[in-house]
Regions:
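S-adenosylmethionine/decaboxylated-SAM
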Residues: 7-172
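Short, small-residue-biased leader/transition segments that mark boundaries at the very start
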Residues: 1-4
């Protein structure tokens, strides 16, 4: 889940960037998307993807009843496969979906970001589990560890891991 502080922080990053196009991988309750939409420029849009179709009945009412519903496109589907088909260049991306596919989400985000755009990746400290050797059955922790190593060694980007709650990595 996303905390009030983290969502508020993300919204401020959007305001500072003067972002008008934002993509989110992993909607869950829609809270992050709503906070991001509040920080968008006039005419800006958040495209938020949730791969778990069973989440729709819970999430859609929160988004549709929010004061920024007109700035959010809630999409049930796989962002990794579907977002590039939009043909949109985004200012920012927020990765907070399946930890096992963070690297794929990251590569997709890079492919749809404008030059100088930002990626925010959530849960990159994963409650401290990234400091331990994961059990072979713990694919979520392994996914985050692999992502952290991948980004750390990616010379295409600048990055900083912020030790906010569960970890937030800012990538440009």
């Amino acid at each position: 889940y996303t905390t009030l502080f983290r969502s508020d922080f993300n919204g401020h990053i959007i305001e500072v960037q003067s972002a008008d196009g934002f993509i989110e991988v992993g909607t869950f309750s829609g809270y992050s998307a709503i906070c991001m939409a509040e920080g968008l420029e006039e005419g800006g849009m958040v495209y938020t993807y949730e791969i778990n179709d069973e989440q729709e009945d819970f999430t859609r009412p929160w988004i549709e009843n929010s004061p920024v519903a007109d700035k959010i496109r809630f999409i049930i589907g796989d962002a990794i496969k579907e977002a590039p088909k939009l043909g949109i260049e985004f200012d920012m991306a927020f990765i907070d979906g399946d930890k096992r596919t963070y690297i794929e989400s990251y590569e997709m985000a890079l492919s749809v970001l404008r030059p100088g755009g930002f990626i925010l990746a959530d849960n990159t400290l994963w409650d401290g589990h990234v400091l331990e050797v994961p059990k072979s059955s713990d694919r979520q922790t392994a996914g985050i560890e692999n992502f952290n190593d991948f980004v750390m060694n990616d010379s295409r980007v600048e990055k900083v891991l912020l030790p906010l709650r569960d970890g937030l990595t800012l990538i440009r």
